[in-house]
Amino acid sequence: MSLIVKICGLSTPATLDVTLQGGADMVGFVFFPPSPRHLDLSRARELGAQVRGRAGKVALTVDADDATLGGIIEALRPDLLQLHGKETVARIREIKRTFGLPIMKAIGIETAGDLAALPGYAAVADRVLFDAHPPKDATRPGGLGVPFDWRLLENLAPGIPFMLSGGLTAGNVDAAVRTTRAGGVDVSSGVESAPGVKDAGMIGDFIRAARAAEINLREATSHVG
């Protein structure tokens, strides 16, 4: 199965176009006012129309209520909801029942103990996203450019679809994929020149590096034994 490459926190037509031209599989849009990447619904509608089926559209929300989710879905028409807050298993089940969209649940990782929540979330979410656990004084749950110890994921039970986030860059994505065998990689701050400011060159570099990482892992795996 091919590695999924997701560029998150896009907010301008120009950087979205670069991302689509570069061949990203998913494009992420943030709906969380404290984030420098936050979109209003008008801009979300505009950017969503620009995608035109060239990549999967992902709406990132944080503990959003049904009214907020409904407005986002109407504007963006996302293919996937990314829940990046403290949503419970019961809340995820409720969102799926109400809106009928696939869900990716973010889980913050700092220690092996943080993986205790995985079985419950994996039972209801379509995939999980492992991100670095935010510092206690953080105002946002993600997009902070902080990696975690990828070795914590080395012994995951097989069959759980997951993506990796947290401090990824063009320079470390190969090691991240090799260590975790993640099914996808998700980057935001790692392709920015300043918080919320995407850099076209960095986006292209990351996508190319992720594709190379996929090839390297496939070749390494084929040579084992």
From Swiss-Prot:
Q: Which InterPro entries match?
A: Aldolase_TIM, PRAI_dom, RibuloseP-bd_barrel, TrpF_fam
Record bears the keyword Signal: no
Q: Which residues form a coiled coil?
A: none
Molecular function (GO) terms for this protein are: phosphoribosylanthranilate isomerase activity
Identify the pathway.
Amino-acid biosynthesis; L-tryptophan biosynthesis; L-tryptophan from chorismate: step 3/5
- As recorded in UniProt, its EC number(s) are 5.3.1.24
Q: Which UniProt keywords apply?
A: Amino-acid biosynthesis, Aromatic amino acid biosynthesis, Isomerase, Tryptophan biosynthesis
The organism sits in which domain of life? Bacteria
Output the Pfam families linked to this UniProt entry: PRAI (PF00697)
- This protein's record includes keyword Amino-acid biosynthesis: yes
Disulfide bond positions = none
Q: Which GO terms describe its biological process?
A: L-tryptophan biosynthetic process
- Protein family (similarity comment): Belongs to the TrpF family.
**Which NCBIfam families does the entry mention?**
PRK01222.1-1
Matching entries from PANTHER family are given as: N-(5'-PHOSPHORIBOSYL)ANTHRANILATE ISOMERASE
HAMAP family attached to this UniProt entry: PRAI
Stated name of the protein? N-(5'-phosphoribosyl)anthranilate isomerase
